[in-house]
A protein has these predicted regions:
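Membrane-proximal interfacial segments on either side of biological membranes
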Residues: 1-5, 9-17, 28-124, 136-222, ...
Length: 251
């Protein structure tokens, strides 16, 4: 169970002003300081700083979101003049270290998950986002604009070792297919990709570079270049991602 503690004043019968609010959980307390006013006009101007929190000490609903282990730290400033939280201006940063995460639409855990995220009102900046999945390592730097509506995501992806069958299906569907479907249906993504060592079935490719565009149910990998034991690789790959069906791709 959880309780909320608060301190404040009632300067007049029609309003309440709080200057400290704390969410008290069985093993951790999350404090917020500043001003929160109800009644005679709404106002929030508060700072939340958690310190380092161990994921197992947090509520069960967080584990249900897929995060199973790691350490989280959050520092946010929240300002607003309307009760609707979607209108509030949120700035600050969030960090995750040593994370273990299960993401809907991806087969297998994301391991050694590290993230440092800078938050602004309509923009989220992933300063660092790295993890390992099924023997591959991925590091991402990206900016997400318009994240409250249809996100526009730009940035770069780097990998020392990547199994390309995570993206290009060997059978009917890839291990991250459902996740890609969701992204392609809800977002617009443009990412530069650099892979030191890539593999697909029996093909090994070095110094692989490409640009990925994802939108409107389609994954478009262009400006594709690399070196294999059979020579130079170049081309473009367009993958249609119909929900719950095999991918249709042109090479």
């Amino acid at each position: 169970h959880a309780t909320v503690e608060f301190e404040g004043v009632m300067p007049q019968s029609s309003s309440i002003k709080l200057h400290r609010v704390a969410l008290v959980l069985p093993s951790v307390t999350i404090p917020a300081k500043g001003t929160m006013q109800f009644g005679n006009g709404f106002l929030i101007d508060m700072a939340v700083a958690t310190g380092t929190l161990s994921v197992p000490s947090l509520p069960e609903w967080l584990a249900k979101s897929g995060l199973e282990a790691g350490n989280i730290e959050v520092s946010l400033d929240v300002k607003g003049k309307e009760p609707d939280w979607k209108t509030w201006r949120v700035t600050g940063w969030m960090g995750l270290t040593n994370g273990l995460m299960l993401v809907k639409g991806i087969d297998g855990h994301l391991q050694d998950f590290y993230a440092r995220v800078k938050v602004a009102r309509n923009e989220v900046e992933f300063k660092q986002l790295s993890f390992k999945i099924q023997g591959s390592d991925v590091a991402i730097e990206a900016t997400v604009r318009n994240w409250m509506a249809k996100p526009i995501i730009t940035g770069k992806i780097e990998s020392n070792q990547l199994d390309l069958s995570l993206v290009i299906p060997k059978g009917e569907r890839t291990p991250i297919r459902e996740f890609l479907e969701t992204v392609a249906a809800t977002s617009h993504v443009t990412m530069a990709v650099a892979v030191a060592r890539g593999r697909y079935k029996h093909l090994k490719v070095g110094s692989l570079a490409a640009r990925i565009n994802i939108q409107d149910g389609m994954l478009d990998i262009d400006r594709l270049s690399g070196e294999s034991t059979h020579g130079y690789v170049a081309g473009r790959l367009v993958v249609q991602l119909p929900p719950n069906a095999p991918a249709d791709f042109d090479l």
